[in-house]
């Protein structure tokens, strides 16, 4: 199976209000009979905390059908269940208005059942409102269902006030057991919300699930809809019917009617089969006789058709108004996903590594003068890790690679990762399938020509007009264009003489024989209105596939940008050209104000705390006696108190990202497995507050918001730390401004926090006295890679023009570089260098590699010995 991006916020199971009619387009219904069936097996959940469980003799113990621990995806059948939520009442409701009591109502949102929010009626001016209203949801207990109960104050003249939200994990419920809960919202004021839950079997629905233990893809149906006009048209212009299917990928479409029996125009809707979806259809406005009607047109009432009772393959006809009929047929979608669910490497990368090992083994035998060749399991996986820094990182990486090539370490490397400006070098190199076997001095000379050229012609009207046409085409293909795309066009102009139509997937030609290291480009996925502290996710790109290791979800790189739903490809969009990827990978304009403050100050907690919602776990409040649980892994029940109006306004200003790159989310529609937090792979990358709030994670988002990784930590280590890649030696090439050791120290701290095997930070020197190379290891951790760290500094290069070759007095000036000073020609904002500045930086980078050959060989031998010991004593 493969993987890809798109998304919205719709999900899977439906819900209906037990005491009220349907809201929306209309209430006229045609309801076929419901087929009955038997449930294959039963699934129970636990009781918890401040809950009173009734009828304990009927409780069914937990027996999950799809308890996932493996790294690959699995398929199985699981029944759906009916959940009834009875909102009983509240006591001591907090006062929202100064002059009167709260006009209180409660909304219910369960996104794993439906995107529609349900609400109780409003009870005005009451301290102890009582509703006694019931709502019914159809849920899948193999996914993480968290019900959000929001208490609101209704205002007639202004926007309703959101007082608080209770997040309740439904995995605490026992099957066939009424659970009576009093949520202690404010123990000091004795404010509480009283709710009753009942989970029952649904004997008519059992669906096929595909999961990797973190994400779950549910069964999807396709509804084909034709519209027929029952009388001849008098006009040439067709009037379309407006058709909406709730919780579907398409949501709303216009369907042109035609004459029977030919149906040239049809619409397709894709929806989760067991979400209790509704179809709403509205006929075109009809003209009235002015003698009988005060207006010239008459709006037809919409009609509604529930879809959960349609039989697959059977055509159902629905009258719409007086003159139209809808003919609809439901059919199951394929269970084969286009998103690859799994944490292992894709087959293409596995095959590449096997081919590359042959190249590496031959190179190492010559480098180390080995008497015997290396066995396959003895060949170390060496990776080159480059950081960001604009043109400075691009130019320095050329110099470093030139040095590594001369030492044969380039041919010994299996991976090369980069972010920001380093990706400019990588993308240029991989346009040539044989680049690493050629003398890189030719490529460096060509790069020099472009770095020193004048960039002002890029802003001339004729050039801007061409870019405008390109961006319009990009938008017409289905992409949301931003200033980041313009930035990508400017990078393209700065790196070459003509338009580059290459794609990321085209770089596979440079890997087909294992002739070059595998390039991996890194960004982070963020939220438009949330600080990086609260939410960020690693997102990697390779010529084979793109995806997120935290979820174990990947798609072929040529499908990046296409639209997906529940793991299935809905609409293929042309793969973006490389210039747009370069703009994305170095999207320096996507930073919000709060993240900028965090990067430049150590006292960021002031703004962070002042603008953040208050979270209060009420799991341990001794309001009610504890009840034994059947499930060991429920989320804590949490009360979320919104920020004040002023804080919220301030936060919107601070967290807004006006130029963030948006791409269709290939996880859209999928849901999280009920035990996703216990999954070892997810836990490895679970590093933000929102990871324990499943309704806020990426699978519910329409778009991915991708950002330059340097805004979190200026390194591209994450792809190399995946245990599946088994990297033994990482050559860290640092190009960041400011503290040279900060990215490495941040990575060490991150790995310690996440329990990822990595060396401890052991550099004692300050930035003014750093050495050219450090070798770091962690002898206590067998799986920790060896790290050879190269800060971008000018040390012995000031006196030596080559290792062991001193400079003459006339050459001393060539060894002086102002890399990080206030008037440095290498500042991150600089796109253009002088020829002298370019040459100095390339020679410095090359020299630092060549001058530390012995340390690189030392690091290599350590990595090989560690790998040999690990293979002899597998853990």
Curated annotation (Swiss-Prot):
UniProt note on regulation of activity: Stimulated by cytosolic Ca(2+). Stimulated by anionic phospholipids such as phosphatidylserine.
Region called Disordered, residue ranges: 16-70
Expression tissues: Predominantly expressed in brain, heart, skeletal muscle, testis and thyroid. Expressed in neurons but not astrocytes or microglia. Expressed at lower level in stomach.
Phosphoserine sites (modified residues): 808
Region (Required for localization at membrane structures): 865-875
Entry GO terms, CC: cytoplasm; cytosol; early endosome membrane; lysosomal membrane; plasma membrane
GO molecular function annotation: calcium ion binding; N-acyltransferase activity; phosphatidylinositol-3,4,5-trisphosphate binding; phosphatidylinositol-3,4-bisphosphate binding; phosphatidylinositol-3,5-bisphosphate binding; phosphatidylinositol-3-phosphate binding; phosphatidylinositol-4,5-bisphosphate binding; phosphatidylinositol-4-phosphate binding
Low complexity bias spans: 61-70
Primary location class: cytoplasm
pH-dependent activity: Optimum pH is 8.
UniProt-listed Pfam families: C2, cPLA2_C2, PLA2_B
Keyword Membrane listed: yes
Entry keyword annotation includes Transport: no
Domain PLA2c: 332-875
Obligatory cofactor(s): Ca(2+)
Entry superkingdom: Eukaryota
Domain C2 intervals: 60-183
Binding positions for Ca(2+) 1 per the UniProt entry: 97, 103, 153, 155
Entry-linked InterPro entries: Acyl_Trfase/lysoPLipase, C2_cPLA2, C2_dom, C2_domain_sf, cPLA2_C2, LysoPLipase_cat_dom
SUPFAM superfamilies: C2 domain (Calcium/lipid-binding domain, CaLB), FabD/lysophospholipase-like
Keyword terms, alphabetized: Calcium, Cell membrane, Cytoplasm, Endosome, Hydrolase, Lipid degradation, Lipid metabolism, Lysosome, Membrane, Metal-binding, Phosphoprotein, Transferase
Active site residues of this protein: 420 (nucleophile), 708 (proton acceptor)
PANTHER family: CYTOSOLIC PHOSPHOLIPASE A2 (PTHR10728), CYTOSOLIC PHOSPHOLIPASE A2 EPSILON (PTHR10728:SF24)
Function statement: Calcium-dependent N-acyltransferase involved in the biosynthesis of N-acyl ethanolamines (NAEs) in the brain. Transfers the sn-1 fatty acyl chain of phosphatidylcholine (fatty acyl donor) to the amine group of phosphatidylethanolamine (fatty acyl acceptor) to generate N-acyl phosphatidylethanolamine (NAPE). Similarly can use plasmenylethanolamine as a fatty acyl acceptor to form N-acyl plasmenylethanolamine (N-Acyl-PlsEt). Both NAPE and N-Acyl-PlsEt can serve as precursors of bioactive NAEs like N-arachidonoyl phosphatidylethanolamine also called anandamide.
Comment block on domains: The N-terminal C2 domain associates with lipid membranes upon calcium binding. It modulates enzyme activity by presenting the active site to its substrate in response to elevations of cytosolic Ca(2+).
Name listed for the protein in its UniProt record: Cytosolic phospholipase A2 epsilon
Organism encoding this protein: Mus musculus
Gene designation: Pla2g4e
């Amino acid at each position: 199976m493969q993987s890809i991006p798109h998304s919205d916020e719709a999900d899977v199971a439906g819900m209906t209000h037990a005491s009220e009619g349907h809201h929306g387009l209309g209430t006229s219904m045609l309801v076929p009979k419901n087929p009955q069936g038997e449930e294959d097996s039963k699934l129970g959940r636990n009781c918890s905390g401040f809950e009173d469980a009734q009828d304990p003799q009927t409780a069914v113990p937990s027996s999950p059908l799809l308890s996932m621990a493996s790294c690959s995806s699995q398929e199985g059948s699981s029944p759906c269940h009916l959940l009834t939520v009875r909102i009983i009442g509240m006591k001591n409701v907090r006062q929202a208005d100064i002059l009167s009591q709260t006009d209180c109502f409660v909304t219910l949102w369960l996104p794993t059942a439906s995107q529609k929010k349900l609400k109780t009626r409003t009870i005005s001016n009451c301290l102890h409102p009582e509703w006694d209203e019931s709502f019914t949801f159809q849920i899948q207990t193999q996914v993480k269902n968290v019900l959000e109960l929001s208490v609101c104050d209704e205002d007639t003249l202004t926007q309703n006030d959101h007082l608080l939200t209770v997040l309740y994990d439904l995995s605490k419920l026992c099957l066939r057991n009424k659970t009576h809960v009093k949520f202690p919202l404010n123990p000091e004021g004795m404010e509480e919300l009283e709710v009753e839950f009942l989970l029952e079997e649904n004997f008519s629905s059992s669906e096929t699930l595909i999961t990797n233990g973190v994400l779950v893809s549910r069964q999807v149906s396709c509804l084909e809809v034709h519209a027929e006009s029952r009388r001849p048209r008098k006009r040439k212009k067709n009037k379309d019917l407006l058709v909406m299917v709730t919780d579907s990928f398409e949501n709303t479409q216009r369907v042109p009617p035609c004459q029977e029996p030919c149906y040239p125009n049809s619409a397709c809707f894709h929806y989760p089969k067991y979400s209790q979806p509704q179809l709403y259809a509205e006929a075109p406005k009809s003209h009235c006789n002015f003698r009988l009607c005060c207006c010239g047109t008459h709006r037809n009432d919409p009609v509604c058709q529930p879809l959960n009772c349609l039989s697959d393959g059977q055509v159902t006809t629905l009258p719409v108004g007086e003159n139209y009929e809808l003919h609809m047929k439901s059919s199951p979608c394929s269970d084969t996903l286009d998103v690859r669910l799994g944490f292992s490497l894709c087959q293409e990368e596995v095959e590449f590594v096997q081919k590359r090992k042959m190249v590496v083994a031959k190179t190492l035998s010559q480098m180390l003068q080995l008497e015997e060749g290396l066995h396959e399991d003895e060949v170390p996986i060496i990776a080159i890790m480059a950081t960001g820094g604009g043109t400075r990182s691009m130019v320095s990486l050329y110099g470093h690679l030139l040095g590594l090539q001369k030492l044969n370490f380039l041919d010994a490397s299996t991976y090369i990762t980069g972010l920001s400006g380093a990706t400019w070098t990588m993308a240029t190199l991989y346009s040539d399938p044989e680049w690493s076997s050629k003398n890189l001095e030719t490529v460096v000379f060509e790069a020099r020509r472009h770095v020193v050229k004048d960039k002002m012609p890029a802003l001339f009207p004729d050039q801007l007009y061409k870019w405008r046409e390109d961006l319009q085409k990009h938008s017409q293909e289905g992409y949301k264009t931003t200033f980041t795309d313009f930035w990508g066009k400017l990078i393209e102009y700065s790196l070459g003489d003509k338009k580059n139509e290459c794609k990321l997937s085209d770089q596979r030609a440079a890997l087909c024989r294992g002739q070059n290291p595998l390039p991996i480009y890194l960004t982070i996925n963020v939220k438009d209105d949330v600080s990086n502290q609260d939410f960020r996710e690693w997102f990697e790109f390779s010529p084979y596939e793109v995806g997120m290791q935290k979820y174990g979800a990947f798609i072929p790189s040529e499908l990046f940008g296409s639209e997906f739903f529940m793991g299935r490809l809905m609409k293929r969009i042309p793969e973006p050209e490389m210039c747009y990827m370069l703009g994305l990978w170095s999207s320096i304009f996507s930073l919000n104000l709060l993240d900028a403050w965090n990067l430049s100050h150590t006292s960021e907690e002031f703004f962070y705390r002042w603008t953040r919602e208050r979270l209060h776990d009420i799991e341990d409040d001794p309001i009610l006696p504890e009840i034994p649980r059947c499930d060991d892994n429920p989320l804590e029940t949490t009360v979320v108190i919104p920020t004040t109006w002023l804080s919220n306004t301030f936060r919107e200003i601070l967290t807004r990202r006006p130029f963030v790159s948006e791409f269709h989310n290939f996880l859209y529609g999928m849901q999280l497995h009920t035990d996703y937090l216990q999954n070892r792979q997810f836990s490895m990358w679970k590093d933000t507050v929102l990871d324990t709030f499943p309704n806020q994670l990426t699978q519910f988002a329409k778009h991915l918001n991708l950002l330059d990784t340097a805004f979190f930590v200026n390194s591209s280590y994450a792809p190399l730390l995946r245990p599946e890649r088994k990297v033994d030696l990482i050559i860290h090439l640092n190009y960041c401004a400011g503290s040279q050791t900060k990215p490495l120290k941040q990575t060490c701290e991150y790995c310690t926090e996440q329990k990822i095997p990595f060396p401890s930070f052991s550099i004692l020197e300050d930035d003014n006295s750093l050495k050219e190379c450090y070798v770091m290891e962690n002898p206590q951790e067998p799986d920790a890679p060896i790290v050879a760290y190269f800060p971008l500094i000018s040390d012995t290069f000031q006196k030596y023009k080559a290792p062991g070759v001193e400079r003459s007095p006339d050459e001393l000036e060539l060894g002086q570089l102002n890399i990080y000073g206030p008037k440095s020609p290498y500042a991150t904002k600089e796109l253009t260098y002088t020829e002298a500045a370019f040459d100095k930086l390339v020679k410095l980078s090359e020299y630092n590699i060549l001058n530390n050959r012995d340390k690189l060989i030392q690091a290599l031998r350590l990595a090989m010995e560690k790998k040999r010991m690990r293979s002899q004593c597998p853990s």
